[in-house]
Amino acid sequence: MQYVCSDIHGRYDKWCALLAALDLKPTDTLYVLGDVIDRGPDGIKVLQDMVQRLNVIPILGNHELDAALCIPKLLQEVTDESIAALSGKDFAALSEWLQNGGGPTLRGLQQISPTEREELLDYLRNMDLYAAVEAGGRTFVLTHAGLDHFEAEKPLENYELLDFLLGRPNPRDEIWHDKNKFLVYGHTPTRVLREQMGESPADTILRCGQQIAIDCACVFDGKLGCLCLDMLEEIYV
């Protein structure tokens, strides 16, 4: 089976609960559509667990990108002194990351060795921007935030980096001509999307035409949602 979740945001408790619920077999695959870290307390623990699992495939989120830009400046030792020694540009990037919820991740980095930080940095750097998956007779394009500046005939490799990371799709938009092709993404909580659509907010997966939004706001007292692509079954913890 092939599964997809997103926006764990440091909720190691939710991550462990999801793994227990799925009981992944070696032949199963779980795609994680970015924003594993930040905001919640234990993003580093989630990443360290993911690194060990060959059948867990990470997709880059904007929070991973922010961390990957900041961590190299802090690799040798994360201390108050090393932070104070940052250049103006680097300090601005670090400040932006912290304002966007990077504090718990930075504290987690302080608790592991430089070697472990380097391993996680390599993991972040090697995350793909998207995956195209065949399951249950359907095609699924998996990204963190949809596809900004969408064009039906545009190849995925021609999109810009931030098109994958910062998009705010309208779930009601029709996209590809192939009605058996679906775009699956996180980034914007489904409660927010539902409110924008004039619906009552709910922390559940939103399916609208060819778009499937799966960020169920687990770090905001919502749920960690997961979709089985083969059966379109929804799992929540």
Regions found by a protein language model. Name each.
Residues 1-49:
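N-terminal active-site segment of His-dependent metallophosphoesterases
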Residues 5, 32-33, 59, 142, ...:
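Generic enzyme active-site microenvironment
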Residues 7, 35, 50, 61-62, ...:
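Divalent metal-coordination and catalytic microenvironments
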Residues 9-13, 38-41, 65-68, 187-195, ...:
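Active-site environment of divalent metal-dependent phosphoester hydrolases
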Residues 17-20, 45-48, 72-75, 156-157, ...:
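Short, glycine/charged-enriched secondary-structure capping and boundary segments
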Residues 25-27, 53-55, 137-138, 179-181:
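A general structural motif
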Residues 43-47, 51-131, 171:
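Active-site neighborhood of divalent metal-dependent phosphoester bond hydrolases
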Residues 96-213, 217-222, 232-236:
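Acidic, His/Gly-enriched loop-helix segments that form or flank divalent-metal centers
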